[in-house]
Amino acid sequence: MVDVDSFVEDARAEISEALGDETAIIALSGGVDSSTAAALAYEAVGDQLVPVYVDTGLMRKGETDEIREVFDYMDSLRVVDASDRFFDELAGVTDPEEKRHAIGEQFIREFETVAEEVDATQLVQGTIYPDRIESEGTIKSHHNVGGLPERVGFEGIVEPMRDLYKDEVREVARHLGLEEIISERMPFPGPGLAVRVIGEVTPEKVAVCREATHIVEDELEAYEPWQAFAAVLGRATGVKGDNRVHGHVVAVRSVESRDGMTARAQELEWETLQRLQSRIAGTIDEVSRVVYDVTHKPPATIEYE
C-alpha cells in the first residue's frame, strides 16, 4: 500500500515541476481517478490548472450536476456539453476498439478547443497502473492512454497516479478530503456508457443503459460490490401487456475485486435478482429481458468492451 502522505507530497512536486508557469487542462470525468488527479493538481498549481469536464452524453445519471456541485471550489472549472458531437462520431461504429479510439480522439479535440481558449500547453490525466497494464498488454485500449490521436496538440502529458492501483487512489482521495460521492464511487470506464452498449451507440440505447445502471447501483449498494452496472447486449423477444415486443436485453454485472486486475462475480440472493429484473424490465419500456453475468475475470474482463 502506498504511503499517502509521501505520495501526495511527491505528486504535488512532480506536477509543479512539470507545469512550471504554464497553464494546463485536466480531463475531469467524474470518476475517482480523474477527480483525485484534478484535486492533486489543483492543490499544486491552483487556477493555473483548468479542469475540463466534458459531458459526452455517455455519463451516469445525474453525474454532470454532481460534478458542478463537488468541484465548484475550482474557479477555473469548465463544463462542456459535447454530447451531440460524441454521438455523431459514434454513429455507425460497432467495433469496440474503434469506439474507444473515436471517443479518445473526440475527448482530445474538446480539450484542445479549451486549451486554445486558455492558452494551455499541458494535459494532466488520471491514468492508473491497471490502465497501463491492459493497454500495454493489448487486452484493450483505454481512452486516456491507447485512444489518443497520433498527434496531440499539447507539449506534455502529466500522469501523477500512473503507478497507483484503484484502492490506493481511494486512499489518496480520502486524504485530500474529496466527498464520499467521489472517493467511494465505483469505477467507471473513461469512454462511459459506450462500452456498456454492444454494437452501435445511440442516444436511445445509452438512455436505457443509464437508467438500468442507476437501478443496479441502488439495489446492490448493500452488497458493497467493487463494481456493479448494467449493459445493453442486443434485442430479444418479450411480452408486455398483450403485445409481443422486440426489446433490449440488459445484463447485470456485479463483481468483487481489490484492484480490477482480477475479479469474481458476486453471488446475489435470488430475491435480489428478481427485484432487479422486475425494476429494470418493469420501469424501462424498451427492455424485454434481464440476465445476470456470473463470469469471473479472467476469463472475462469486467466491462463488456
From Swiss-Prot:
Residues that coordinate or bind ATP: 29-35
S-S bridge residues: none
UniProt keywords, alphabetically: ATP-binding, GMP biosynthesis, Ligase, Nucleotide-binding, Purine biosynthesis
Residue intervals of the GMPS ATP-PPase domain: 2-185
Subunit and partners: Heterodimer composed of a glutamine amidotransferase subunit (A) and a GMP-binding subunit (B).
HAMAP family: GMP_synthase_B (MF_00345)
InterPro entries with a match to the protein in the record: GMP_synth_C, GMP_synthase_B, GMPS_ATP_PPase_dom, Rossmann-like_a/b/a_fold
Pathway: Purine metabolism; GMP biosynthesis; GMP from XMP (L-Gln route): step 1/1
Keyword Ligase: yes
A GO molecular function held by the record: ATP binding
Gene it is expressed from: guaAB
Pfam families: GMP_synt_C (PF00958)
Its job: Catalyzes the synthesis of GMP from XMP.
Transmembrane segments: none
Keyword ATP-binding: yes
Protein known as: GMP synthase [glutamine-hydrolyzing] subunit B
Enzyme Commission number(s): 6.3.5.2
CC per GO annotation: cytosol
Biological-process GO terms, alphabetical: GMP biosynthetic process
Catalytic activity entry: XMP + L-glutamine + ATP + H2O = GMP + L-glutamate + AMP + diphosphate + 2 H(+)
